[in-house]
């Protein structure tokens, strides 16, 4: 197989719940999002939720949008846990966040394993992204905020 083997070492909540899993890799060019890209799974993924304590609030909250998106599209249990643990999530309680990240990653991995190249069921993961990408690029807002607006 051609390409470069890589690992995903995710240090933001957004990366942990979204970009770390799925194998969609892209590069923006000017105002065009993900114009160059490929599908390739990382050799392994590390999601160290302790790192999330170092993030500025704006970056952390951006990741929460992707976490909520995952709950909305596929996991009533995840949604309930987010709803019932809002205070601990805001406080970045590591045990709660670790559980939520794990649930989100497992959900996404299950979807991707059925449709790696995004020809059918995987498209559900794009919820919020259709308008979100346009908002993100033209209004210069963080990805998570744009996805939240797109939802």
Language-model-derived ranges and their functions:
Residues 1-85:
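A glycine/threonine-rich phosphate-anchoring loop and its flanking beta-alpha core
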